[in-house]
């Protein structure tokens, strides 16, 4: 007997007028300042932007949290907005029934208390949680768009399984960091088809937790080069003096590194080499010849990011600027892109292949650093090719935060979400 193929979930009422698309929020934890707060709270109470406070076009109707501690705000926010907190992922997607009953899923598998791998990487149970989401789709014979925050999974094999399973079930996916949706100073976006020969990106923090942000920022720029994305042939992860040696020997372009750092307005005063106790870098060779370096320079750069590239023999650079606390409006622009992805039932300004590639680069880079003594790792499995989507990303074009990006936050009645 021929089985019915997967089909798009059909709402009981129209998504184009009668009501807002219903969203299930699946998250590790929901505490002040975590990604569930910075994304979910904006979808509950309003999206602060340079152009004012924007009312959400989607409605979170169900919530599931893996860990609930004394700082939890998720239960209270859900109750204030008539969203039910469910005991299982399946219940949150079916609203306690037997079949899929929401129009989209936002999955935030970040933060919380989880063990580390032998590589020193936090083993967030993303594949486990997403498999449970896919299982509901498979049982229901229907799918809806899924957004996965930051990255698909902590390991390449898990990420590839998630990607392949989503493709098998026809699930539209969007994944990634908020960095591609930050304001850029100066304003810089490569025209599609640009000839980029070398590029460097810099950021702070540890490679494990912050490297993915730097990679996502970098990839959203270089994927616009001539021929589109073609994938990566090798990755090398180095740290400590090996990073300084790579700069001195020309394996990392000092000119591009200096330009990327020069574009960053808020960095520590003094010598980079004296301030950074543990520099880390990924040296990336792309299949089409592009040579790239991703550096984490904690101590010199702190929650700041820069990018520079050689484009048609000219060096250009920019800073990707986070919006100030407590609004963190760069998440607002990520939310606007997620919302459009849901409303258009799968049109994404952040191709999931971008995130799959950055996941693989990061995992192989850390493996090179920890297991291979900094040697080059060949990556034929990262032959991931795609073209930048023709859906323009929504990101702020003003040079500095303005309007509601600097306004009152949180809204009246939600003061409890600010951690004292």
Enumerate the predicted regions with their spans.
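Conserved acidic residues
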Residues: 61, 99-103, 197
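Beta-strand-loop-alpha-helix segment that lines the small-molecule cofactor/substrate pocket
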Residues: 110-180
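A structured beta-alpha segment of the ubiquitous adenosine-cofactor-binding alpha/beta core
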Residues: 81-115, 129-138
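C-terminal helix-rich "cap/oligomerization" subdomain common to oxidoreductases
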Residues: 3, 9-12, 16, 120-122, ...
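Rossmann-like dinucleotide-binding domain that binds NAD(P)(H)
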Residues: 199-290, 297-301, 360
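NAD(P)-dinucleotide binding in Rossmann-like oxidoreductases
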Residues: 268-354
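N-terminal Rossmann-like dinucleotide-binding module
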Residues: 5, 9-79, 199
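Redox-cofactor binding/interface segments in oxidoreductases and associated redox assembly factors
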Residues: 25, 103-107, 148
């Amino acid at each position: 007997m021929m089985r019915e193929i997967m089909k798009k979930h059909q709402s009981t009422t129209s998504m184009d007028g009668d009501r807002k698309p219903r969203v299930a929020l699946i998250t590790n934890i929901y505490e002040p300042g975590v990604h569930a707060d910075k994304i979910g709270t904006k979808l509950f109470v309003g999206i602060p932007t340079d152009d004012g406070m924007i009312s959400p076009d989607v409605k979170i109707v169900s919530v599931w949290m893996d860990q609930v501690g004394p700082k939890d705000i998720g239960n209270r926010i859900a109750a204030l907005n008539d969203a039910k907190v469910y005991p299982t992922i399946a219940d949150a997607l079916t609203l306690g029934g037997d079949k899929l009953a929401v129009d989209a899923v936002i999955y935030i598998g970040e933060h919380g208390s989880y063990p580390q791998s032998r590589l020193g990487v936090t083993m967030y149970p993303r594949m486990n949680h997403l498999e449970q989401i896919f299982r509901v789709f498979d049982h229901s014979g229907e799918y809806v768009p899924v957004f996965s925050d930051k990255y698909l999974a902590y390991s390449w094999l898990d990420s590839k399984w998630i990607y392949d399973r989503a493709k098998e079930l026809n699930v539209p996916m969007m994944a990634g960091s908020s960095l591609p949706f930050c304001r850029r100073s100066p304003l810089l976006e490569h025209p599609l088809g640009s000839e980029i020969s070398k590029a460097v990106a810099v950021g702070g923090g540890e490679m494990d937790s912050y490297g993915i942000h730097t990679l996502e920022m970098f990839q959203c720029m270089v994927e616009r080069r001539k021929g589109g994305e073609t994938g990566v042939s090798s990755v090398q992860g180095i740290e400590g003096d090996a990073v300084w040696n790579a700069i001195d020997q020309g394996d990392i372009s000092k000119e591009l590194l200096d330009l990327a750092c020069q574009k960053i307005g808020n960095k520590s005063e003094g010598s980079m080499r004296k301030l950074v106790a543990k520099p880390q870098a990924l040296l990336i060779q792309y299949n089409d010849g592009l040579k790239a370096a991703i550096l984490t320079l904690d101590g010199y750069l702190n929650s700041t990011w820069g990018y520079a590239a050689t484009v048609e023999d000219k060096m250009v650079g920019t800073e990707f600027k986070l919006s100030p606390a407590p609004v963190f409006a760069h998440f607002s622009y990520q939310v606007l892109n997620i919302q459009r992805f849901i409303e258009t039932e799968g049109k994404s300004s952040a191709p999931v292949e971008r995130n799959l590639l950055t996941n693989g680069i990061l995992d192989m880079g850390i493996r090179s650093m920890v297991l291979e003594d900094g040697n080059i790792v060949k990556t034929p499995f990262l032959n991931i090719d795609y073209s930048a989507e023709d859906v323009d990303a929504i990101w702020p074009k003003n040079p500095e935060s303005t309007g509601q990006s600097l306004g009152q936050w949180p809204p009246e009645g939600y003061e409890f979400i600010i951690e004292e």
